Amino acid sequence: IAEFTMMGILPYVATDLGISIPVAGHFISAYALGVCFGAPMLLLARKRPLKQILLVLMALMIVGNICASMAPDYWVLLLGRFVSGLPHGAYFGVASIVAGKLADKGKSSEAVSIMIAGMTVANLFGVPLGTSLSHTLSWRATFLLVGAWGLITLYYIWRWVPQVEGLKDTGFKGQFRFLKKPAPWLILGATALGNGGVFCWYSYINPMLTNVSGFSAESITPLMILAGFGMVVGNLISGRLSDRYTPGKVGTAAQALICIMLL
């Protein structure tokens, strides 16, 4: 929710802070920049217990969103978004390892997809809820909601996630050894281009639907629920298929489907 909620409330934030929608888009970029800077933090914490890392990262997310909810101006909100983005990549990386290790034999891909489904469920329920809160109350209530949900998640991690053995430490340089092969670069490139293309339009989905497509402000919530539903279904299906077929085949089929739908 912390990542995607800004897309639905962008016009409300821009109006309240007295800035244009393109300038308000910097808050999305700040989060993404935090993700880029935060992911390498795993290199420094690679010897720490995985559960401890998850707790620290979740606490950092809570701080960032509480800061965003109380931001009096553009710069403080920009800082809050950056801080809340710092744990994003590292959190999903560690959580994927934990999910894979806790899964039954042959079910690791499905387990990871269920964990990642939290991000798609956020699009199904969290983002529309944030949009509705901003429309009826205030955009600040949305970030307060994310912070409160983070506190609940923090408790559940502490209470229910067992201590899991991490991956074998190969040293600082060993973390980059896989980049000597071309396959990781192709995956990184495809991910960058794919996500970049999605965020080019999804970041401004609210003003595009209202100002360009002519939808009313009240219709944004159900439209975003529909988009989120598609993400949830696609994520769950791909997780099951990845345990049966090679990732290359699943990825190729998914990209082909996207191209067909765009046509």
Language model features: what each stretch is:
Residues 38-50, 234-246:
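Helix-to-loop junctions at the C-terminal end of transmembrane segments
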Residues 64-67, 75-84:
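Paired small-residue
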Residues 52-67, 249-263:
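Structural signature of the two symmetry-related core transmembrane helices
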Residues 18, 70-76, 214, 246:
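Helix-breaking motifs and short loop linkers at transmembrane-helix boundaries and internal kinks
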Residues 1-24, 39, 201-206:
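Extracytoplasmic
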Residues 185-225:
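Extracytoplasmic gate region of multi-pass secondary transporters
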Residues 74-76, 105-106, 110-159, 204, ...:
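Helix-loop-helix hairpin linking two adjacent transmembrane segments in secondary transporters
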Residues 80-118:
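Cytoplasmic helix-loop-helix junction between adjacent transmembrane helices
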